[in-house]
Amino acid sequence: RHEEYARLLKGHTTADQIVIIFSGCMASLIYKNVWGDDDTCPVFVESTIPPFSTRRVEPGKVRMFVRHLAPIAFFPASAADKYYDRIIADIYEFPGKFEDVLECGLSLVNPTVHPGPCLVNLSNIEKPDFTFFLYEHGFQPSGLKIDVLLNKERLRIGEAFGYKIHALEDFAGVDTIDSWEPMYAMGHGCHALTSIAGPNDINYRYLTEDIPIA
């Protein structure tokens, strides 16, 4: 999808424009590969999460559950010094910046939140007579233990690149995560999360995107 959109966008930008990609997952590298050395290549900015958690309620109506604030990364990384303050003033109050898009990509929180609870609840997700709520029904010890292991692997990868990743820890509001309890407490203690229904289909992004990325 990123490559398809980048090809549509190429030819309609200038070098002093900024393209912001929410939930970028290192999409800047894909965009740059499409532009190559073209002198119309804009500056790319990535965030780890979308600005809002939303769900479509009905045609033409969307419910917003929570507003997100997360740091951003620039590509090239050197553009941060020039453009960060401008983005804060003109667009959105992003609370800080990553060193580069690799650190940003490794800090995506969903790949260490959704996989475990989804994998151990596939039968409930597929039940036609049951509305599954991930943060209410899925945030149980068995699934969260998988997330803890995924996060430990992610932390080791980050350390190998010289990064101190703390995305899941920030999500849970703790300094370290050594067990499932902090995530359980955070999920069940946040109405903005427990009120989000789904997934109720195995072809949902929690499974088709977050699990492969993890």
Model-predicted regions and their roles:
Residues 36-40, 46-95:
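Internal, well-ordered alpha/beta segment that forms a basic, Gly-enriched binding/recognition surface
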Residues 121-135, 190-213:
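A hydrophobic C-terminal alpha-helical subdomain
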Residues 70-170:
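Active-site-lining helix/loop region of Rossmann-like oxidoreductase modules
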Residues 2-57:
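Rossmann-like NAD(P)(H) cofactor-binding subdomain of soluble oxidoreductases
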Residues 19, 23, 138-146, 206-210:
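Conserved aromatic-histidine-acidic binding/catalytic patches
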Residues 51-60, 113-124, 188-191:
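Active-site substrate-recognition segment that forms the wall
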Residues 143, 150-199, 203:
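Small-residue-rich helix-loop
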